[in-house]
Structure formats: structure tokens, C-alpha cells
Amino acid sequence: MRKLNSLVSLVLAGLLVIGCSNQNQTEQEILSAQALYTQAQTQLEKGDYASAIASFEKMGSRNVQANLFGEQIQLSLIFAHYKTGEYYKALSLAERFVRAYPNSNNMDYVHYLVGLSNVRLGDNFIQDFFHVNRSSRTIESIRNAYGNFQMIVRIYPQSQYVNDAQQWMVYLLNRMAEHELSIVKFYDKRDASVAVVNRVEEMLRFYPASKSTFDALPYMQKAYQRMGLKDSEAKVAELIEMNKAKVFPKITKPEYSKQF
């Protein structure tokens, strides 16, 4: 019995030593995580995005650090990849973030970054510089961006990003209308009258206040004329006459804030 008691005492003593050792190790890991996080944030604030990405990814691969700063690490990585022009990577990380933190208080910020990433994917520096109209380019990223900003306005009406989101929505809606007008012109050149009429009808439904929709009406009138539908042609002519004095506001592209 005495040997057993001695053995139990030795085991308990050993567990106590191990417990203290584990506690010290955890405290050291926490301090290390805090130091690395501070370093990564400093790199991010200085615009050294490549180094910040490397630091945040290093933290994300360690359990203690990932548990302590997991959400903030992912937010910072989304932002850093956006700033380096890696928009598809930013979108991928954002999608992962939404799955991992569905109840995050930063969800409006994530949707805002996703929207800006999609806008950037629809941009082209050279075409911007020479004022080239991009309405005929693939419009998918623009539609996605509109949906991202619309989500902020609808679901997060108190968000600090609502005003910016609304401005982007006006601009993007105009871009989509311009794209539809380019398709109408394409069909008109090929005398595809039915396609012209169908497309303009969609514009009247989805972009009724757009200048591009008004500019599409003469193509619709001509299409009805080609098809010999005089009543429909006359109705469109009347619609054109009613709106000929209408002044459309100039829609300019919102500026990216310095932060983004």
C-alpha cells in the first residue's frame, strides 16, 4: 500500500510539472501570436501587402494564433489581396469567410470588399486612360458587384458603406444598360428585328430611367418597321416624342476612397 501511495504521489507530481509546462508554453504561444499579429498589422498599414500576407498566412497555419485572431486574420487577408490586385483570390477568401463566420459583425465590410473586387474585375486601366467604352465587355462581374452593393443596402442599412454602395449601384446599373444597348445595336446590324424588340422590352422593364434605354427606342421602332407592324411602330414613335425633351443626369464613376 505504501508503494502504491508513493507511486500515486510520483504520478501526481509528474502531472503537475507537465501542467505547468503546458501552461507556460501556451502563454509563450499567445505572446508570440500577439507580436506577430502586431507586426502583420503594421505591415498592412504601411502598404507592405506582400509581407502582411506572408505574416497573416503564417499565423493562420498555427492553431493558437488562428484561434486567437482567426476572424481578423481572414479579414486582413481579403483586404491585402484586394490591394495587391489579386481580386479572384480576394473573392475566394471572402467566400470562405462567409462560410466560417456567418454571424460576423464585419459581414458588411466583406460584402463591400467583394463588390469592389468585382468592379475592379470589370475595369481596365488602359481603357480608362483612353476613355474606351467597356459596355460590350463581359458584364458578369458588374452584375455581381451590383448584387454585392445591393445586399449591403438591403441587409445592412446602418452600415457605414451604404452611401458608397448606393453610388456604385447607380453607376453599375447604367453600365448594365449600356451593355444591353450594345447588344441591341449588334442585332440591328444583322436585321434581327425580333431580337431587337425583345432586348429593348427587357431594357424598358429593368432600366426604365436609363438614357441607354431611351437611345434604344429608335432601334425598336426600326425593327417594327422592318416587320411591317405599323401600330407598334407608331406607339414607339409616340414614346420617343414624349421623351425627346427629357434630360438625363450625367452618371459618373464613383471614386475609390483612399482606404480602398
From Swiss-Prot:
Residues with a covalently attached lipid (N-palmitoyl cysteine): C20
Gene Ontology cellular-component terms listed: cell outer membrane
Highest taxon of source: Bacteria
Keywords: Cell outer membrane, Lipoprotein, Membrane, Palmitate, Signal
Compartments, as annotated in UniProt: Cell outer membrane
Record-level GO BP terms: Gram-negative-bacterium-type cell outer membrane assembly; protein insertion into membrane
Signal peptide, first to last residue: 1-19
Transmembrane segments: none
Lipidation (S-diacylglycerol cysteine): C20
Family named by the database record: Belongs to the BamD family.
Subunit and partners: Part of the Bam complex.
Protein name: Outer membrane protein assembly factor BamD
Organism expressing this protein natively: Haemophilus ducreyi (strain 35000HP / ATCC 700724)
Gene of this entry: bamD
